[in-house]
């Protein structure tokens, strides 16, 4: 190979060699230097290093960071470097596990996972819940838009791997017993992986076949396993059970682990399932997948078909909900147990594509039903619910509204334009809205009870319980005490229900009959007083970061992108013109609250710098390359109307305002594909930007629209604001053929918003 080669040419040459292992390694290669830290650097998943030189002081390409933040940034990066979209997808799925999750950290050299340290009380392992679906889905959509056929080519191509993370999710029976303690660390497997890594390098952290080679599967299998893992925790009418010891995007909801149910992930699954249905719509015959995956898929399909029947006959209740969840959970455990024992798969077998499509249809029915059940009476949507497992019943209770839930519902694709507009109207008038900043908190602010108002046993409950009365009479403070005001309180040492159980068992023998009689009632009183189930974690007890009264700017910008997506979906589907205009108005309402529109005194910081959050008691805090930057890179391209469909570029600037255009002549400086700084003189009533390092100039005109491509061989003009696939691919590949693009836009094609 030459010292420099086009990436597409490299992939082509590797394909011609016909070695699947080499194809895997080449596909996931990303020639970038990038270090990504997010949040508290003391957390192991946030460790990073920006390494530019090797030990011999030679330049190297290297990157590392936590999984979520790497991939959320790469979504925006690939919009400007689209030839690497499929490589990012490969990097993503090659590092996901056999049980459908992802390690917490990713580097050019491979993957990392947190190692359990029994002597460290802060050491904690597990899997975050939402990353596997929505971040992958956004990348899949980009591939489909920029390269319409590439995903189809990969569906049956065995060039993808599984990460071999030494975590073991417990049996479903164990999860039902204690959903907060569900993941164990397999020390023996971890030691074995270390031995293999010593001889094979980074590939030693992947699942291997019997010959010692990396076990490789196709894209259909990888996409299916990610979905099946979520469906294995489906609660009809509730969401996805958070039972892998970690929360989701908002890790300040850490106490929701175990009893929490995510509507957020369910909404993203809806988008994922709809996309997979489109992707497989033209596929016929059989596809080869691992035998254990085939069995899991077929069992899940049958169970979801039963669920569809319950939904159709309006028979979903606490008992039938339990039956469906139990069946799905046991199927997932049967699969996990088998692949854990084998440390991999036994063989491959053919599965009819129609079976997968049937599964997707069944799943969509269950998902749509559950989303509908989680629409509140005011038109907003629940984000997280609470689960109670009692014998053979699953009961679902609700929390307060959260901004995250509205973003997920809008992003799901399940809502039509009038429903979206109604939800946004309600959101702006809800307790989530902070008028002083014209934007949204993560959840409504609320007044927490003072310390002395906590842990009070209502007198009617204390007086009616014979055991409590006996303990107080005997002046036994093991379980309850009376304070100076006569209020009955639980002993401060009873930090959880397990400790309460221990202390009840340790009471004197003469009280044990009363303990047996009143045990259930005591636990009910304990939960009534503390309501542990509804405690969300740091989000319910702190006042900065993701705490009470706090604006988290990344989620605000996620809302902005979701509203923009709904706007373009409405235009694509020829929705009512008034609904489309209302969506545009809502978009700019959300946008108006973002920092760059504010003065330094309003924002509490320099307005064009990204900040993590704004607490109620101060200005913007914690500057840095937050996820907000990624979302607003994407929304800005959307405002400019750059829409990629079927490999073509459609310029549709209907969200762009006239005020964006220069009123005077200006000079525009940009860096071209040869890394040379260039100047472009702009006329009044124009604006300029670059995409794939090609300058694009918009000009306001009073006549008809037009588009001009200035190429090496001359000019190409068109009355349609469309760049065909041939020239679009030239732009995406940065091949230098297109030197500049000029777009003439009549005022009536721009937004009417001032």
Regions found by a protein language model. Give the residues of each.
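Acidic, mature catalytic/reactive cores of soluble proteins
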Residues: 1-754
């Amino acid at each position: 190979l030459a010292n420099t080669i086009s990436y597409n040419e490299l992939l082509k040459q590797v394909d011609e060699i016909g070695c699947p292992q080499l194809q895997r390694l080449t596909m996931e290669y990303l020639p970038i230097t990038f270090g990504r830290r997010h949040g508290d650097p003391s957390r192991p998943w946030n460790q990073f290093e920006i390494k530019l030189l090797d030990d011999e002081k030679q330049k190297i390409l290297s990157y590392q960071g936590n999984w979520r933040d790497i991939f959320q940034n790469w979504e925006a990066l690939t919009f400007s470097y689209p030839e690497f979209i499929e490589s990012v997808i490969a990097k993503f799925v090659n590092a996901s596990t056999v049980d459908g999750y992802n390690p917490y950290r990713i580097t050019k050299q491979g993957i990392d996972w947190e190692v359990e340290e029994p002597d460290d009380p802060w050491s904690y392992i597990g899997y975050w819940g939402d990353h596997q679906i929505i971040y992958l889905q956004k990348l899949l959509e980009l591939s489909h838009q920029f390269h319409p056929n590439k995903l189809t080519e990969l569906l049956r191509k065995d060039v993808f791997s599984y990460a071999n993370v030494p975590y073991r999710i417990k049996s479903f029976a164990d999860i039902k017993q204690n959903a907060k303690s569900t993941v164990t660390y397999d020390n023996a497997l971890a030691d074995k992986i270390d031995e293999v890594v010593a001889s094979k390098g980074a590939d030693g952290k992947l699942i291997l076949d019997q010959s010692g080679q990396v076990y490789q599967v196709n894209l259909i299998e990888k996409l299916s396993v990610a979905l099946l893992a979520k469906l294995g925790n489906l609660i009809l009418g509730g969401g996805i059970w958070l039972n892998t010891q970690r929360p989701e995007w908002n890790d300040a909801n850490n106490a929701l682990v175990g009893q929490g149910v995510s509507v957020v992930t369910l909404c993203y699954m809806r988008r994922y399932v709809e996309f997979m249905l489109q992707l497989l719509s033209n596929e016929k015959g059989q596809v080869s997948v691992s035998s254990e995956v085939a069995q899991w898929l077929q069992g899940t399909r049958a169970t979801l078909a039963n669920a569809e029947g319950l939904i159709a006959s309006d028979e979903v209740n606490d008992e039938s909900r339990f039956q469906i969840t139990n069946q799905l959970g046991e199927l997932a455990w049967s699969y996990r147990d088998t692949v854990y024992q084998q440390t991999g798969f036994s063989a491959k077998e053919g599965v009819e594509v129609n079976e997968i499509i049937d599964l997707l249809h069944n799943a969509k029915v269950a998902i749509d039903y559950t989303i509908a059940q989680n629409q509140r009476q005011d038109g907003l949507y629940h984000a997280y619910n609470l689960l109670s497992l009692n014998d053979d019943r699953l009961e679902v209770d609700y929390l307060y509204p959260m901004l995250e839930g509205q973003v997920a519902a809008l992003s799901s694709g399940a809502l039509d334009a009038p429903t979206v507009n109604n939800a946004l109207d309600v959101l702006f008038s809800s307790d989530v809205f902070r008028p002083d900043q014209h934007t949204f908190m993560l959840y409504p602010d609320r007044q927490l009870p003072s310390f002395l108002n906590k842990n009070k046993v209502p007198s009617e409950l204390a007086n009616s319980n014979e055991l409590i009365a006996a303990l107080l009479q005997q002046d036994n403070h093991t379980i309850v005490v009376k304070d100076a005001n006569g209020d009955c309180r639980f002993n401060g040492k009873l930090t959880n229900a397990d400790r309460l159980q221990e202390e009840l068992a340790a009471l004197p023998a003469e009280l044990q009959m009363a303990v047996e009689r009143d045990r259930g009632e005591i636990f009910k009183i304990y939960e009534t007083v503390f309501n542990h189930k509804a405690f969300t974690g740091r989000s319910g007890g702190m006042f900065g970061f993701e705490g009470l009264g706090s604006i988290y700017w990344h989620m605000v910008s996620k809302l902005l992108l979701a509203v923009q997506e709904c706007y373009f979906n409405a235009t694509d589907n020829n929705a009512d013109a008034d609904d489309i205009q209302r969506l545009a108005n809502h978009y700019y309402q959300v946008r108006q609250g973002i920092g760059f529109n504010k003065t330094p005194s309003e924002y509490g910081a320099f307005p064009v710098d990204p900040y993590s959050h704004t607490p109620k008691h101060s200005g913007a805090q914690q500057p840095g390359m937050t996820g907000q930057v990624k979302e607003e890179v994407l929304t800005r391209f959307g405002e400019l109307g750059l829409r990629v469909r079927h490999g073509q570029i459609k310029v549709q600037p209907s969200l762009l305002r006239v005020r964006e255009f220069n009123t005077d002549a200006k000079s525009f400086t940009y860096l071209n594909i040869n890394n040379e700084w260039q100047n472009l003189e702009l006329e009044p009533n124009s604006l300029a930007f670059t995409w794939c390092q090609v300058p694009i100039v918009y000009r306001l005109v009073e006549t008809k629209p037009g588009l001009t491509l200035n190429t090496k061989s001359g000019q190409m003009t068109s009355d349609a604001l469309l760049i065909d696939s041939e020239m679009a691919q030239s732009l995406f590949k940065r091949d230098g053929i297109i030197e500049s693009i000029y777009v003439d836009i009549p005022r009536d094609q721009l937004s009417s918003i001032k």
